[in-house]
């Protein structure tokens, strides 16, 4: 644009401009003259006006329209051009903003080549060709035949839109005569007549006219493509006019450069004329162009509210021919121009030296014609000028000169003072990387020019000869003024879309920008999950600081939309925050607004690295810019950005990362927060410092409210640089830098602070966060921080929608929802769960509902959301954010205090968690951060919004999801450093802390938690939280103790309904959590010290535990280490189990991660609907899981010691007792982990059976599950939205759920055993998810609980089997649970179907699956089956595949659990598992507690059932039998999640032991390992040694069974074909199984098994041939198998 402006100025200055232009494009213009002699009809006007056109001042239509006018000889072109220039510019801008989509996508008018958008449409009555109403009416004035097929028509049908109804028909008016007189006619070179204009072809080379009939031979059809007259077709005649091609390209370039040239840019890309270029078409185009320009001018100031009526008026006016008046060039100069042309044109031409060459070339044509041609030649000259203009524009771009901002006459110098992405591209990438080798070629559009200059291609050669008018005939004329939509107003709102559009067709530019990104330091580039790259350092700080710099950036953005990273970054951040923030900031600068959006969009991207925190701010900026890119123009309405550095920075931080800018709101005001940068360097310190710093800032910011949203995004990993809040941090470095660090550290909660303001932003940011998660967490975790940040701003729409900033901005509330959050939103908004207190709160409370409120459930969902893009890291991030636990409270409450910063919110959450034990938080560094204050205030602030749902869940509901607030604390711990620069690292630490905290806090005092919750309640959910808190205290304690008392159960139920005992679990674990937190903090500190990778690892670990697949590996290891340490201190067998679980979880999670993404997306949707309560619970359960770890590792020793003793029976009743609960919590936390999911789903169900008071108490263990889930599952859950959704689904049927929940809770007395099966609990968390539905059914059936211990034992076995069966129908498991008596035969009966359903799956993990299912089924066979069958439908049926997976997992878990509880039962189970598993009683269609839960159950069902359901039975056996079904139901969900996308439940369960091992693993891998892990965990509950041994044994047993199954399946074909003998069959089976069982991976990959078997078969065959009796060494294939 600037180039154009410069050109314009030059053109207007005859002296200097003339010579330079002539000099630069003299040859071109001469050549053009000869070829385009007629090109400039109004040469006088063309002189300067064409320059204007060339400059693109007319942007979209002017240059093209001008030419058509000139060509047509309508002298209006001169004045019209000038007027058109302004009008077109305006119109172009309007078009750019209102019509950001490429015109190529839509049907376009054959005459003006403009897409049908809002203009009135006219169609000839005789054909179905659509034209703009004014185009066809103008056409009909001279010819009444269709321009396309020449069909004669007498009426024109007017329609309001393309394919719209016919509003009216108007007769054709033939005004041809009059106009012919006025206009300067084109005469046929052969006959010399100017009639029959519709058949008077114009040569595309010289513009000479020829009638079709006068040609030799005559043409029968009007050529649509280029047509050259006989003269021009002679080779060599016009080759000299090589400039013409450049002019063609230039035209495109100019059009592209002009902001309004949205449609032209596209035409440039590939639009070609749709109808023949005749005098008629040219005249019509010129007239239409003029009319539109003038009408655009007229409409320019019409209020928007009048626009709608304008459409009708326009139609009327056009129909009545009023627009013809406009067409008749109100500009008087035209008539004189025509006459001048005739009389003095030649002189002018001579004077220009153009006419002569033209006339000489075209001497043949009459004098009139010659004059015309000469004029055209002049036009060509103008074109030459254009050419020069192009060169000029290139130079201008190089110099940083840009089109002056509207309203100013001086060109703006946009050259950034500091290197920006654009500059870097130009200086580093574009210049040196220029594909054309032109060091001066800085603009991608210029590259087009150069291309056109290349004469090689035939098309180029032809184009070379094209006259300007011919070239223009391929370009759309001025866009019709959209009467329906106020085009002008739209532009005002988002005038810059055109800026983005220019880059759209710019493939080269994107490549170059990518090159520049690649050339940047890896530290400055963020790789998003979607594979996109963005510059960490947004625009140079100086750019943002200086309005001039910003302006330049804007121009550069406009001119060089090329910075791929920039636009994307811009789009993501800008769109989110730009609109909102910018509207206020730049609303005064509307003119600049058009340009500004682009500039700003780019500016954020190009923010000074110094200004932008490298990991935090720069990430934010780049992410922010990404939204801006999409939204480039409108989002970056940062007029202030351009005008004032402070404003710009402010805008950048605010508009780019509204969500992330939770703290941004405050920082936003502090535009020049350069200090932040100094803080930013601390990002590495974020581990602890980031937390503290964040907290400090968060309180100061007062954006705590938004913390949830930001944290959620961060947790989700969506809140990356793209997060509006974060991106905008640029100007709030001081406050936001730390906050940002803190917020990232907080688990990507920073956006939350601005969540209320950027609710929409949060959504988009989140969506985007998916893509930019890595950016945010650049330092510590690859993408979590950035992604989280983005999440807040771009709505995972970046992920998914990150690029579509506009959409994201519009959908900001939904981007999260639509992308990954759609489900999240559901969960958050899940009204059905509002009563449950699930995640309803987030919707109600969070700007994200999705903002702070969203945090709790959003964290879960967010992770889920993240999971798709970067499940591993994002999930882990989520875990990190588990401060959300507190944030749940905080999230709801901090929403009002977004300024506080997500970290603040997170800290507040931590503080809340630490409210129970501030010392803990402080130990973890959260306390320092402002544990109580921020937690109290932020938590209250944030919590109040989500509290509605969460309150329902229980006060713990906030924390339940995060394992009471434990998880949040953990996250905060990571942030503990409080150094804004170290948000990433702290986040990692925080995440880890969260996990441990969750379990510790969960076990910790319920009252402490209540206290914390009380604070939260005080803020927003004071009353509800208090009620919840009281519930949590009694209920959570009840849950913790699994109290049998009805009151406790009621509390539990209420908490389930509200928190689903999630918070309870947190409360239980709170004291232990504290100890655990300290350990975690130490561990995390340790890990953080290990290095930035350690940070990422820590964060990932914590997230892993919470279900983050990607991060799970690192975090997992660290978690394991931590857990081992904790286990050691715990002195229980559970520590070993837990360690094992961690390992298993890591493995399974890794596997799960792969499958997780798939399932996650599916399940996430389901979960999102239910996710609110379920997610919160699961989140909390993971927290609990961590707490369990902590207590189990530290405090647990004291608590677990009683627990193991009471595991079998004491737990049954001890569960309800406060102390036992605590100890149980230490062990049970994991069991509860499993149950929490169920509880979550059973929030309502808990109320059902009073008899199940104890089970209900156990269900609170679900809170413990929350602990487990929180640590392991929640992250997985988060990463696997599906599970949450499914849990929600389970939860969705409240009454069935309630019913199920109670029985499940009834069984929880059995889970008293879970102390012993704490590892199982870890598995159970997963089961719990699935269990929800089963739980409901189970609750309705307290029979299993009533069963004698022996019965329960039987149940346990049956449950294990049922677990196998459950895959096909989880409902069966509950039935089995209910009818333990039928256990043996029930599981057997079920087994057949299981075998059938499971058969395919069995290949991958047949044995384990079958066993678990059979046990579970047997257990729940009759009553449970009946009950569950009906109940199951309530639960959303999962995919059959999910069911299968669940079955497998269940089999494993049940198997392991049963053996674990009672070795004999395990063996029995194993044997049974060998049998086909099918639960006939369970309807195959019956949803498996969600199908997904079935999978989850697989892992933890066995352990949980054995532990939870055997209170009456021997602790180990009884629990599995009673709990298994319920766990099974839940577990399938987890398993499915593991397979697909939601390892949440399964991972959660396994998580407590092995944070997310299960979840990260691929589905198949995960299924087996997870199952094994679950089984191991299940076995672990007894004693560390026992658990370990049993776990090992069961694991080996299951592995062996599965190996045997797989080997048999693989060898069967060979044996059937008699390729191997019976002896060989046995040998191969023995060797292969041995080989497989000794594989290091612990996985049984059917493909590898098949390869191994085949290798053995080949070996034996070979040996047979050589008569070798020895089998020899195993084939190397075995190694592959492992």
From Swiss-Prot:
The modification Phosphothreonine is found at residues 332, 1412. Residues 1585-1612 form a coiled coil. Residues 336-361, 369-384, 1009-1030, 1053-1063, 1091-1104, 1119-1129 have a biased composition (Basic residues). A zinc finger (PHD-type) spans 185-235. Keywords: Coiled coil, Metal-binding, Phosphoprotein, Zinc, Zinc-finger. Residues 832-856, 999-1008, 1288-1301 have a biased composition (Low complexity). Residues 1064-1090, 1147-1161, 1182-1197, 1574-1588 have a biased composition (Basic and acidic residues). The modification Phosphoserine is found at residues 447, 457, 845-846, 864, 867, 919, 982, 1000, 1135, 1201, 1368, 1379. Residues 609-620, 630-667, 734-748 have a biased composition (Polar residues). Pfam families: PHD, SCAF11-like_C, zf-RING_2. One of its GO terms (molecular function) is zinc ion binding. Residues 1308-1317 have a biased composition (Pro residues). Disulfide bonds: none annotated. Residues 1-81, 330-412, 444-483, 532-582, 605-774, 825-856, 911-1225, 1288-1322, 1419-1445, 1463-1496, 1567-1588, 1663-1682 are annotated as: Disordered. A zinc finger (RING-type) spans 109-150. Residues 41-81, 919-931 have a biased composition (Acidic residues). Interacts with POLR2A (via the C-terminal domain). This is PHD and RING finger domain-containing protein 1.
